């Protein structure tokens, strides 16, 4: 029997496994944290009146888009073709978890900002509108507060649905990868959702 030892390593011939850098784990953690914040903030609205909540609890929804933006920036750094991101928003494919996730991420910003504005008291709305660069948006902040306050139940429902979608879609996306047998499971979506809730506010 002859033994052949091969010392070459060609990515065009030999199978390669791509190992994630720090960018993807950062996005997964911050995305799960944002999902937990959205879900708990939405559920808190039905259980605790605004008068019984601390200032931190009322301002908490604003943290979700900030955390998500940092996570998406990290994810963008991991992409090879960064200029092609816009193509996700040129179509919607019902059978594609990545397409669902792209549109969910887009809807999170108005939903979380609306819930945050609805939670503010009158004095806080005025203070927010007079702070630094937000002075240019003072009128929009006041209008957003009035609109979100009138439609509070709808805004809470949007945060709950989008938070659940954000928490579960990444697991569903990874679960469709047949090349990773350990990931190819229907349990991965609920697992990501529970993990996201565990990182949310207590």
Predicted regions and their residues:
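Membrane-interface interhelical loops and short amphipathic "cap" helices
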Residues: 1-24, 50, 79-99, 144-145, ...
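An N-terminal structural lobe/cap that precedes and organizes the functional/catalytic core
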Residues: 4, 11-26, 31-32, 36, ...
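Long, contiguous internal "core" modules enriched in hydrophobic/ aromatic residues
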Residues: 21, 28-32, 45-52, 57, ...
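Central hydrophobic cores of alpha-helical transmembrane segments in multi-pass inner-membrane proteins
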Residues: 33-45, 68-70, 111-116
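Membrane-interface helix-loop-helix modules in multi-pass inner-membrane proteins
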Residues: 70-131, 174, 181
């Amino acid at each position: 029997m002859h033994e052949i030892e091969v010392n070459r390593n060609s990515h065009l011939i030999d199978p390669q496994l791509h190992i994630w850098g720090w960018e993807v784990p950062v996005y997964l953690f911050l995305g799960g944290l944002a999902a937990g914040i959205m879900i708990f903030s939405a559920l808190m609205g039905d259980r605790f009146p605004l008068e019984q909540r601390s200032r931190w609890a009322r301002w908490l929804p604003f943290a979700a888009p900030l955390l998500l933006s940092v996570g998406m920036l990290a994810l963008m750094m991991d992409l090879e073709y960064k200029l092609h991101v816009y193509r996700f928003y040129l179509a919607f494919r019902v059978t594609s978890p990545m397409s669902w996730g792209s549109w969910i991420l887009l809807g999170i910003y108005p939903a979380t900002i609306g819930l945050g504005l609805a939670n503010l008291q009158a004095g806080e709305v005025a203070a927010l509108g007079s702070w630094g660069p937000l002075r240019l948006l003072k009128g929009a902040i006041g209008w957003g507060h009035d609109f979100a306050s009138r439609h509070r139940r709808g805004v809470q429902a949007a945060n709950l649905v989008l938070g659940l979608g954000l928490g579960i879609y990444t697991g569903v996306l990874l679960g469709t990868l047949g090349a990773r047998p350990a990931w190819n499971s229907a349990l991965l979506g609920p697992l990501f959702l529970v993990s996201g809730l565990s990182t949310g506010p207590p």
